[in-house]
Structures are given as C-alpha cells and as structure tokens.
Amino acid sequence: MLNFLSLILISLLPISAFAIEISSPAFKDGETIPKKYGCKYNGGKDISIPINFSNVPKNAQSIVLIMDDPDAKKVVGKTWVHWILSDIPPDTKYLDEVKYGKLGIGVAGKNSDRSKKYFGPCPPKNEHQYNIKAYSLNTKLEKSLKALTQKKFEKLYENEIISSFMISGKFK
C-alpha cells in the first residue's frame, strides 16, 4: 500500500520537479580530472571530458553545458570559461570525449580563450577546481554563447532555466 501511495504522490509532482543530473565516467565528483583532459600546455591533450546526462525534465527544450574555473580569478582576475555548449538536444544521454570537444552536437560557444572549442584545465600553478554545470532550459537559445560563466548565464537566463546540476573536479 505504501508503494502505491508513493507512486501516486510522485505522479502528482509537476514535470519540473525532476532535475537534470550529470556525471562523468572519467572522474567522480570532487576527484582529480585525468591529465589527458587538460590543456596541451600542461601535458594534456585538450580532449573534452565525457559527460552522462540523466533525469532531464520532460518539458526541457534544450541543455546548456558550461565548464569554468573560478580559481582563475586569483590569477587572471576573472572566472575562466573552458567550455560552453548550448542547444544540446534534451534527449542526449552522453557526450563523448573528443579532441577540442568538437562533438557535432549543440552549438559551441566562445570560451575565455575566444575560441569555440573545449580548452582543457590549465592552471599556471597550484591546483584549481573546475566546475561543470548542465542546465535544462524551457527553450532553445539558437545562438552561440560568448564566454559566459555559470553565474552570468544564471543571471541572464534565470527565467529559462528549469533545473541544473554541477560536478567538480580538481586539476594541477
């Protein structure tokens, strides 16, 4: 009887009660990002981090993915955007690892290096934390985003965001 009541209560929740989730087979949240995903200047290969998507709300029209480095603020005076993809189809389950993140899916935005590609973690010294955040949106943006940090994106698109989820990794 309890399971039946639970199912009824869950079915009464609004569609937006289900929030997008992401994970990576390359590393667990809070752990170290493997070297190959780093920038070529730090011995990496600039291969994009593979991402799994789950629990995308049924009313989502698109997904946006932003990877940034808030620790860069201490070095360059701003949060550094390493990767931004908009208009990822909401039925996408997985983004594969690809050189420079050229996936052929979604719309690549300009990173802080002013290029439309994945730029791997590249701290000049000391360990940095890299945040990868996915947003489910109630619309398609149909444009390339320009070096928007997660905070700026959230401010500009607060009315379009249905849900979000973030994982973090360390890199030295």
What are these regions (language model features)?
Residues 4-16:
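Sec-dependent N-terminal signal peptides
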Residues 18-172:
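N-terminus-centered regions that define maturation/targeting leaders and the start
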